[in-house]
Amino acid sequence: IGPAGENLALMAAVMNDKHRAAARSGVGAVMGSKNLKAVVAQGKKNPTLADTEGMRKLSVTISKEVGVDVKKGSSLREYGTAYVPQVTNTLGILPTRNFQTGTFEGTDQIDGVALKEKYLIRHTPCYRCPISCGRLTAVDDEEYAGKGEGPEYESIASLGSACGVDHLGALTKANYWCNELGMDTISTGMTIAAAMEMYEKGYIPEEDIGQPLRFGDADAMIEMIQKMAYRDGFGDSLAEGSYRLAAKYGHPEIAVTARKQEFPGYDPRGSQGMGLLYATSNKGASHMEGDLAYSEVFGVPEKIDPLTSEGKAPLVARFEDAFALIDAAGLCVFLAVRYVFDEDVNLWPTRLTQLMNLTTGAEYTPAEIMQAAERIYNLERLFLIGAGSGKNDDTLPYRMLHEPLPDGPGKGKVVELDKMLPEFYADRGWDQDGVP
């Protein structure tokens, strides 16, 4: 962990491989609270496999299957996740100025094309990955000079459009700082965005902050990141996250959170399934608990209408179970979703079952694997309920339920959570109070 974790900032991440982050839910602060700086694993032995030759053959098959998609022309390969701002902006769901709108006029200046033209050094793939979505970048602008990885889409949305910042060099520098300090870029950027809105509306006095904090002020944003990590001055309030910050100043409606965690980069008013996902995610607002954007936004395996709430409950449950399995197996989402949403619905459990059996020597069936996914999600849910977070927290912030989107294809829409939530409980076999 970095200084943010040491100072128990609630958006502190656990960093690994220099630029990779276990970022959400304040896990860095948990380590910091235990005076645990790092966990180190050392060893020279290779992992043992139950069937080495079988695994080799299956790996070749999987590489070819994934490679077919890559060869067709993958934006993920060419631009990394930085290609996504253009997609979400077109759909009107790009978080802009703390989710006050869903379109950002500066998108062209901070997207993957701009990043590739200005700052890209090379791709940084994980070992033998055919997708190669990682990016090593360097900013040569004197004011924001630096070198590192990223920014990824979520960082662009939270540190860029959500804060009204359209300077790619400043945004990239902010991303570097978050990595150096050990911070979740999503909660960091979204918390600053909430503070910017409250400052502009006169809810936070300038003397509390020590300086102006307006949307679009990249230098102020970067300074706030450093203050958050060290709990310096106003940074002490920011380090508590937007939910507590907004409550402190008497305007809880400004915070855009679920289970007190800041939203990622998809405005659910224009992506209804994402709204249900945020409300029911076991770790608070998260796109990594079952990203329905794959279908609503990217059309995988087929495009579904993001503006309707009809039929979204069973889809969200399916996505949540699939992502639980991906995490449990230690797989990359970008590789795994190629199977989760294949036209052949049996391909996903079949491939994962093969991987599990060749690794462990077990004889799982696809049905058993899928049942395990449901058990994982239900067990997490029971843990939450035991901690006092059940149906009462299966909700969304005021803005999502009562303030219609002002622009984009979803103009006039709010999240229809009251329609989707009972259907979701029923689909999962939970009672009307959301208890498995």
Model-flagged regions — what are they?
Residues 2-25, 31-436:
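Extended C-terminal regions of large enzymes
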